[in-house]
Amino acid sequence: MEPPGEKPGEAEALSITPQLLKSHSGEFALDSILLLKLRGLGVVDLGCLGECLNLEWLDLSGNALTHLGPLASLRQLAVLNVSNNRLTGLEPLAACENLQSLNAAGNLLTTPGQLQCLAGLQALEHLRLRDPLARLSNPLCANASYWAVVRELLPGLKVIDGERVSGRGSELYQLCRDLDSSLRSGSSPGPRAIEAQPWVEPGYWESWPIRSSSILEEACRQFQDTLQECLDLDRQASDSLAQAQQALSPAETTSSFVF
């Protein structure tokens, strides 16, 4: 991705105010805000955002931020998305001791050294500097070895750019990366590749004739048995009703002569 420039349809540049925070969170007090989504508002100044002392989840993606100063006071912040901005540094985040997940893809971070400020964050496990699906990156990602440098700089990370680098499942991601590397290094002009062939034979996906199964037959048999039981019960009920009517008939005839 090219460094982020003017964002299409960017709203008028604005600074974060108490009124804006309250209207987007529905809270009356800034220190009551736990979750805040301020995506794509054209924010250039974080203003009073640092007063949201209990904020835990914050989305500032798609704005025009160049610094994160006020975030230094957000000690409870656990998840932060500042992707697609114009950041050249992340130093204020060094004070966010509870930060667990950071998305900084699509900014102007040029060297791994700019991530040194995150080294003291013991809780940080997820870091994204590049997002291929959203076509967001940072200049430092142009170096093919940036992954290794970031892992050495931040050994506590478990996920980088959405791929697990340690813990359960990391071996599979490493295998895929090694395979990609070998394919890239082995690519050279040579004999024409064999034309791809279908995976299955013609007609494989055609539907097969419906076959009766023992399960279906057993289900039909049980249904027929149940239906027969219902018919027997209905017959018994009809007989009982007829007998009851016959037993009551003399009484009704006698009572008709009483004045």
Curated annotation (Swiss-Prot):
The keyword Transferase does not apply. The keyword GTP-binding does not apply. LRR repeats lie at residues 54-75, 76-97, 98-119. Pfam families: LRR_9 (PF14580). Residues 138-178 form the LRRCT domain. Keywords: Leucine-rich repeat, Repeat. PANTHER family: LEUCINE RICH REPEAT PROTEIN, LEUCINE-RICH REPEAT-CONTAINING PROTEIN 61. This is Leucine-rich repeat-containing protein 61. It comes from Mus musculus (Mouse). The lineage of its organism: Eukaryota, Metazoa, Chordata, Craniata, Vertebrata.
